[in-house]
Amino acid sequence: MTKKVFDDISRLALKALLYEVSLSPKPGLVDQLDNGAHDDMSFLTFVDSALALAPFFKTYLDIGFYHAKEDPGLIFERLRVSGIEAEQAMFSATKGVNTHKGVNFSLALLLGATGMYLASQPQLLAHVTAFTEEDSLAICQLVKPLTAHLLETDFGSLDLKKELTYGEKLFLDYGIKGPRGEASEGYPTIAHKALPFLRKSLRSTDQETAQLQLLVYLMSIVEDGNLIHRGGIKAWQRVKQDMRLLHNSALSATDLKAALSAYNDKLIQQHLSPGGTADLLVLSLYFAFLENQL
């Protein structure tokens, strides 16, 4: 039974990746209509990448489930090792293009946490779509102990480093913690903002429109390192403001798609891509599938 449930959950993680790239139109992002602000990847690149990562999803679950009683730091290291192997498979499939590196990090943590949670909730092994809102929140909270050391390890001695990554520079200059910060705080954007928003939207509109509405909402609130990297702080703040206006406009499904298509043209011209938002959309969809919301 455990194997079947883990296979099912792994498929939901893959499904989340495929739904995200298929959702169209997405401003600045790769989708079925165009490559957004990217000239080195396409829709099929993302499909290849997702399929390359998929075999590792069950490994992440296994690590969390079978090592649930270990020190969380040790579980994290096990997940990190497998995550690096998955990343190498991704780069091999995409010929060196970084399609899913960030979201692979988050999926490793959340699938590992899902495995840990299932070890303490055996009744859920009977039916994969029996997860509740409380289960999703508990899984997000389990990431906290897994990543308790992460900010200190990665950001604690930056003053001693000669060369900094862009994420490290963002932390030093603006205090932006990026995916590490989101993980270390138990994915509050997912648990307390994205999922409640998506659940509410799904009660009043169709699945595709609800996902597009979620994309707009996330773009209006997320600290998106990809946007900042490409355009700077002001460009990111401008996109957030534009999306806040779109979010508050309550457009029909048809008008929303038209507005997103027009904004896609704008971001392509500015070479801006909200990749951080796309990652959080994937994670939101994963939990929506677990809860059988989608």
Curated annotation (Swiss-Prot):
Signal peptide from the UniProt entry: none
Catalyzed chemical reaction(s): 3'-dephospho-CoA + ATP = 2'-(5''-triphospho-alpha-D-ribosyl)-3'-dephospho-CoA + adenine
Enzyme class: transferase
Protein name per UniProt: Probable 2-(5''-triphosphoribosyl)-3'-dephosphocoenzyme-A synthase
Gene name of the encoded protein: citG
Alphabetized UniProt keyword annotations: ATP-binding, Nucleotide-binding, Transferase
Pfam assignment, any one: CitG
EC number of the protein: 2.4.2.52
HAMAP family: CitG
InterPro entries linked: CitG, TriPribosyl-deP-CoA_syn_CitG
